[in-house]
Amino acid sequence: MSSPTSPTSSPGRHHWSNSKDGMPPEYTNQDPNSDQADNENSDAKAHQPQHSPQHSTENQGHTGTSDTSSLEMELSKLHPESKQRQLPHSPEHERSRSPIASVVSYRSHMTLEDENQIFNAEMAVRGSQSLQRRPTGRSVRGSMRRLSSHRSKSMRTSKSKKSGDYERTAENEEAAQEAENHLDNFGVVTFGTEAPIKAPDHPVTIFGRIFKFIQQRSFYLRSLIYIIPLGVLLLIPVFIGRFYHPQPPYRDELGHEYERHLHVGGVDLMWMAIWWEIIWLSIWAARYAAKVIPYFFAFFVSFISNNVTKWRCMAVALEFPITLFLWMLAVYVSFLPIMTRRHIGDYGVPDHVRVKLPWQQSANNVLITLFITSIMNLVEKVLMQLIAMSLHRREYESRILYNKFAINELARLYGYARQRSFDFKDAIHRAQADVFKFADHQHGKKRAAAARVAQNALNKTTYKAISAFNFATDMVNKVAGEITNREVEKSSSPKSVVLHLLKTTRGCQSLARCLFEALVNPENPDLVLDDFIPVYTDETGEVDNATLEACYSIFDRDLNGDITCEEIELACVEIGKERKSISASLRDLNDSISKLDGICMFIVAVITLFIFLYLIARNFSGVLTSAGTTLLGLSWLFSGSAQELLSSIIFVFVKHPYDVGDRVDVMINGTVTSAMVKEISIMSTEFRLLTGKVIQAPNSLLNTLWILNMRRSDGIADPVTVNLKFGTTLQQIEQLRIKIIDFLKEEKRDYKPDLLTEVTDLPDLYSMSLCVVFFHKYNFQDEVLRMRRRNMFMCALMTYMQELDIVSPIFNSPGKSKDSPMYVNFNNGSMEGVKLSGGNDGGGTENHRDSTVGGGILKNPKAYPYREPTPPGSSDSDTASVSKKRVDFSLGTRHLMPAFDDVADIGSKRLGRDSLPDAVIENAGTEAMRREAEERRRAEEEEYERSQQESSSNEENENASRTSGARFSFSSKASRLSARPSARTVPPLQHISIQDLREPNENNTSKSARL
């Protein structure tokens, strides 16, 4: 909702000076710019929404009104009067203001909807979402928005779907948390190549419920639940083989007795069962080892790398491949020693002969194949992680660093604003407590008193449990942060509120207006750098200038020195969109890498098959020849698909010309198509056209096209070509340039103060094509802003051309103007009474021919922009002297030549970590990045100190040379020759100073005489 603007204010600027008696506008939901605002002011005051969980109805009676009034009183007592600039208390203002609006700053740009958005975010981060999902637990903001009847009906009729909505909301929260982890752990991309086994959302059978219950437990408890039952079952054959002997002992020829053992495939049953037990326990031992390996790996990597977190996260992502490798290693190593050393003879007696039975040889070949497969799988996963990390570092590291820094600074500013203007902590607790006083109404019917009391008690218990859980979570995070030396955000921290507000465009605008309201000076309509100093001043009074300037540059993109409320809104919206774009890009990148991983796994499976055939086949060469012949014969079938796949892989992972959310211009068949990147996959890309249509294009085709990425572009030049009348004077063109440049300087927030004009063509001496090139300060990523800026320029251009009487070439046609009359030739003779404009002597025709055809534009007095028309009676010499004055035929482009030198842009790199300020890296970077920034700053400081010392020593030497030079002088001949280099050695006591060389010869002579 826009704020009222004064008639003298520029468009898009927030002013409140048009209100009566210099007072700010009243807080209503009406648009201040609408014509009906004054007429409906009284109705808006009468229907002002209150802070209550439901609208007042006749069924609620006097209780709801009293509770709402008490809630308003509680909300109005949040801050002392010394910390706020409240509006004057009057009955009219009291009726028009909400309880939260009463504590808003004096020059408020915030509306009631903005306050609702912030209050909504504060409620959400404090764990009240579970109460909001319940019909009786609606928050205070529900009534403030006056829900429509359709929404109220849908909420009443959806009670049977609450459980399903809860599950979907939980899934969305998990997805949001995963995206948050992707943004936090930059430098590492974890892709889900091994999806965990998930239980159904709504299990029907008892076994499904049990499995879901087990899957929801922690890993260690879940592993014990799985290990113990099956491990105990596998111990049964071990005890049977050890203690149970159904047959009598065997006696050999010498009379020795041997116990007969049960055997399976010639191997003792006990040892066979032990090997089965090893198979089961080794998989969990490998899983536990994979959990511990990242910490040991990080310890050893810390000796050679500073970025330990990245490699530890990589080892965590490789948990499943490492588990598979260790498991197959244990199974393969334990198979042959157990099977060959525990052989049972023909009579069931161990013969202690190491014999490899045929089935054991075949099983060993299978285990070898699986072990090699696990090795190839681990190597393939490591390569995929390295590719993902390299692509992530190249494309997203700088964007994530800058976005995290911007969010951290927004959180700092919001924390300052919350302490300064409106702290909702007490209001939220009271509001949540008052919410429980209202009973739920189902289809307009009241529940029984006992049910209402029970429901209120349940809600209170739930609220207390949530508060206790949040408190316990904050305490655990605090202890964990002290142990790990890391700062952990609280559940109700300003950053959590900022992240919640950045999810929607409306929340971004509310956050921006809140920050502007808290920082702006009452005497200045805009923000300046000094307004941010209280936020970045520590307890000792020192100001963090580096972080302050970096934060100020987030909002002051045009570098004009001040920040308007609109600029903060655009910056916050851009930060929110950038965060969503990065999350979507990382998600699509993970999907693409997962598909590439699937392709590589198919290749690994083919290699595994050939290895297995090599181990079991007697004639492997024949099998390989047959397979090669078949593959060659079917090459025509999948050759095109293989080529398309290779082109797509190169396009996505090597070229990577765009990311999700980028606006691109693709040239297809000579036609430029503008679209927004919606989704990127390994084989195709989905675009959303500006018309709303969604199209899909294969990456193999896009690999051969020209693609213009608007987001990666800087300020863009926008040419406009206009056709003017032939004979348009240079004075008119110069005046047009001056007016347009003044317009660009006035609108310096959107345009650069540079203008290029070029006469491109003079077709048939009938018209003149003038190309006007102006420069935007931003790119064309936002189509709405591009249209707005171009419309402003086009309207200004049209207005100035109309003021200067610059017309279309159609006015050169006969009869269109007085300068180009239309002559009519009658075959029957001339018309009587018609007199030519040149007179009877025909001199007028000759003069007209001389002034237009013979003289041309250079002899036309109007063509000279810097001279007055030649007065009558002046001599030809005066006219010739005036005609010798220079005319700027470059149309103002001469002074712009050095400014548009494109040589410096050739070979320049994109925005990387080196181009980011140190404050951004220290605030949002990893520990390794912070150390690099500190080392770089330390090196710069040492270099600066060294240069200062050298400069001071040079000054001392120069002063010494001047002092010694005053005692010695040379003759005029020597002074003239002293400027040339000499091969002779200078005496040690003679010093030549520049001051001596610049003195006149007579001074040198007098000095030498005195010496």
From Swiss-Prot:
Residues 543-578 form the EF-hand domain. Disulfide bonds: none annotated. Changing D558A: Viability decreases in a calcium-dependent manner. Signal peptide: none annotated. Residues 1-11 have a biased composition (Low complexity). Residues 1-101, 124-177, 834-882, 917-1011 are annotated as: Disordered. Its main location: endoplasmic reticulum. GO terms for molecular function: calcium channel activity; calcium ion binding; stretch-activated, monoatomic cation-selective, calcium channel activity. Residues 27-36, 49-71, 873-882, 963-975, 1002-1011 have a biased composition (Polar residues). GO terms for cellular component: endoplasmic reticulum; endoplasmic reticulum membrane; membrane; perinuclear endoplasmic reticulum. Residues 74-97, 162-171, 928-948 have a biased composition (Basic and acidic residues). Residues 1-223, 309-319, 388-595, 655-1011 are cytoplasmic. InterPro entries: EF_hand_dom, LSM_dom_sf, MscS-like_plants/fungi, MscS_beta-dom_sf, MscS_channel_2nd. The chain crosses the membrane at residues 224-244, 288-308, 320-340, 367-387, 596-616, 634-654. This is Mechanosensitive ion channel protein Msy1. It comes from Schizosaccharomyces pombe (strain 972 / ATCC 24843) (Fission yeast). The lineage of its organism: Eukaryota, Fungi, Dikarya, Ascomycota, Taphrinomycotina.
